[in-house]
UniProtKB/Swiss-Prot annotation:
A GO molecular-function descriptor: zinc ion binding
Keyword list, A-Z: Aminoacyl-tRNA synthetase, ATP-binding, Cytoplasm, Ligase, Metal-binding, Nucleotide-binding, Protein biosynthesis, Zinc
Designated name of the protein: Cysteine--tRNA ligase
Family of the protein in this entry: Belongs to the class-I aminoacyl-tRNA synthetase family.
InterPro entries in UniProt: Cys-tRNA-ligase, Cys-tRNA-synt_Ia_DALR, Cys-tRNA/MSH_ligase, CysS_C, Rossmann-like_a/b/a_fold, tRNA-synt_1_cat_dom, tRNAsynth_Ia_anticodon-bd
EC number annotated for this UniProt entry: 6.1.1.16
PANTHER family (UniProt xref): CYSTEINE--TRNA LIGASE, CYTOPLASMIC, CYSTEINYL-TRNA SYNTHETASE
UniProt short sequence motif 'KMSKS' region, positions renumbered to this chain: 266-270
């Protein structure tokens, strides 16, 4: 498998530290608000990576953290009067619900910063003992001048605008220096004084706590992932701390997904063009949004448009219509050529768009073969297995097709539709075909189509 290693600025052959085992850390959200499309892009991109590695036979340990103590959360507390736990628990629950709707596999580890304070404090003590951290009136800071490898991950330099635009840095020795522990009497006890951890320190401590091989003094993990907006300074600062604390690299590979754009503008709250995943899920099934996110390469800047979302739904609908055709058939063996085609595309730095093109071709071919030979049980069994493979690797076409096609219909509406179908069944039994047709027309006006099967009528919501 080849992946793009941001720190190398090129595609490289992926070779895990321990053969057959892969450790991945994904920077998760700061939980002060609901998940937006950028969070979804990152989660889906590296969920795909995890699925592909598992399909290739690797045992994967996957961690995704929650930053649950941060200035933004404190601001939310001041605005709402709610406690830290009330705010963070609420948005963690919302985030997990949203990611579940996108078929993102639950991580093996979901550490929260506030649950790892002992590890964070111990880590800061190591940095202080190494002489690479210093104290000011407002906190403990990391001395970036002690790291000759600073900028090695991001490839930036001291002339970058991100550095130059800092006009004043108070008691810090250098504008690049960052806080490890922020003094604040309202928060947590530590040997340095009451306070709370700095963002850049939390992730390193959690990686060491949950993914590193501490028993054998092996700190390095295989892959550190996140959005490209985290590359500098966040990931640069993480890597720098690890080198200075343990004289070891934090991660062998660094992977980053691209920005989200909305109508060709970068999505951001300042531009008032960001939107929440929960709002998108009111209008489309979660798998549609996942499919749409997969149509663009994970490193590309993803440009959201309603038209492209609709196009993705139409492509996914075709997969579900095939699933409907083979409903009730026991899975056989997946076609090895098809499996190889999928994995070959995805092993090339997660080329999901190429993999989806292979899926499109499979669906087209399957429908043609079933049209020509609808009683071919062996082929139907192969189709079911291929569909299961698509679900396993790409995380789509997992839902029951009835549920998928009935998305967006309320329970109250479903009850009303079922009453009409029951009435229609009685009318047909009594050979009152005029009434049966009236009910079909009434349902059509509700944007509902019905199909008669040996087991009774089934219905679905049409595209509007």
């Amino acid at each position: 498998m080849r992946i793009f290693d941001t720190s190398k600025r090129e595609k490289v052959e992926f070779s895990p530290i321990k053969d057959g085992e892969v450790s991945i850390y994904l920077c998760g959200p700061t939980v002060y608000d609901d998940a937006h499309l950028g969070h979804a892009k990152s989660a889906v991109s590296f969920d795909l990576l995890r699925r592909v590695l598992k399909a290739l036979g690797c045992k994967v340990k996957f961690a995704r953290n929650y930053t649950d103590i941060d200035d933004k959360i404190l601001n939310k507390m001041a605005q709402t009067g709610q406690s830290l736990e009330e705010i963070t628990n609420k948005y963690i629950a919302h985030y997990e619900s949203d990611m579940g709707a996108l078929n993102v596999l639950d991580p093996d580890f979901k550490p929260k910063a506030t649950q790892c304070l002992e590890a964070i404090i111990s880590y800061i003590k190591v940095l202080m003992d190494r002489g690479v951290a210093y104290k000011t009136s407002d906190g403990i800071y990391f001395d970036t001048s002690k790291d000759s490898g600073y900028f090695s991950i991001s490839g930036k330099d001291n002339n970058t605008d991100l550095i130059a635009r800092v006009a004043s840095f108070g008691e810090k020795r250098d504008e690049k220096d960052f806080v490890l522990w922020k003094f604040d009497e309202k928060w947590y006890e530590s040997p340095f004084g009451k306070g709370r951890p700095g963002w850049h320190t939390e992730c390193v401590a959690m990686i060491r706590e949950f993914l590193s091989d501490k028993e054998n003094d092996k700190f390095e993990i295989d892959i550190h992932a996140g959005g490209i907006d985290l590359l500098f300074p966040h990931h640069e600062n993480e890597a720098s701390q690890c080198r200075c604390a343990y004289h070891k690299n934090l991660s062998k590979y660094w992977m980053h997904n691209g920005f989200i754009k909305v109508n060709n503008e970068k999505m951001s709250k300042s531009l008032n063009n960001s939107f929440f995943v929960k709002d998108a899920l009111k209008n489309v099934h979660g798998e549609v949004l996942r499919y749409y996110l997969l149509t663009s390469h994970y490193r590309a800047h993803f440009n959201y448009s309603d038209e492209d979302l609709v196009a993705s739904k139409k492509r996914l609908d075709k997969i579900y219509r095939l699933k409907k055709r083979v409903d009730g058939v026991q899975a056989g063996m997946a076609n090895e050529s098809f499996k190889s085609e999928l994995l070959e595309a995805l092993s090339d730095d997660l080329n999901a768009s190429k993999a989806l093109a292979s899926v499109d071709e499979f669906v087209k071919t399957a429908n043609e073969r079933l049209d020509n030979n609808p009683k071919d049980k062996a082929y139907k069994a192969e189709v079911v297995a291929n569909l299961e493979l698509i679900g396993e690797i790409l995380g789509i076409a997992i839902t029951n097709y009835v549920e998928y096609f009935q998305f967006g219909v309320s329970d109250e509406q479903k009850e009303h539709i079922q009453k009409l179908l029951d009435e229609r069944a009685v009318a047909k039994k009594e050979r009152n075909f005029a009434r049966a047709d009236e009910i079909r027309d009434e349902l059509a006006k509700m944007n509902i189509s019905i199909m008669d099967t040996p087991n009774g009528a089934v219905w679905e919501r049409n595209n509007e």
